[in-house]
Amino acid sequence: MPSLLLLTLPSFFGLALAQGVGNWLREVHPKLQWSSCAAEGDCQKIDAEIVGDANWRWLHNDNGYLDCYSYNDWVHGTCNSTEDCTAKCVYDGIDYKNALGIQTANDSVSLKLQTRFDFSYSVGSRTFLMENRTMYKTFTLLNNELAFDVDLSTVECGINSALYFVAMDADGGVSRYPGNTAGAEYGVGYCDASCPRSARFIGGKV
């Protein structure tokens, strides 16, 4: 299975597989350039974009503003069963700079550990490189060389700041799970071997 590029700061929440899309905030992916080079050194700049992981998105009731998930638990006043929460809860767009502290400039991306906004704050973030608006970028690792410059000068001891590859569905699971209309465009489908117990959705269901 192809691997996907992720840029990661520590997560204190868990993976998520969002099913639907809300309409409170339009999703606008930050732009990011990267270069693809031939063996002879001829490089071509690729105008791409990144997307924030669904786990850092507002999960709320469809056509409403009631939280579905808060303080690492489901809000039973909003939904009260696996079927109910799966059907009712949707993810919204991200204010990347002001809510998550994610900024891009040409071929660089900056992530903040903590970002304060509107009487609250966010901790950590995770982003994925995109092929286009609705598909993650996949890489063939065999017989290819990949290079990154990573600035860790402001990362303090004990903070997990990582850049790595992970196997995922390129479309974020849209083709595998009929109820999943958010997909890669909304950062859905992260998966790794650690099996976080705080997962909100697994296999398209709560």
Please give the residue ranges for each predicted region:
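A long-range scaffold signal marking pre-active-site subdomains of enzyme folds
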Residues: 15-206
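Fungal secretory targeting signals
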Residues: 1-20
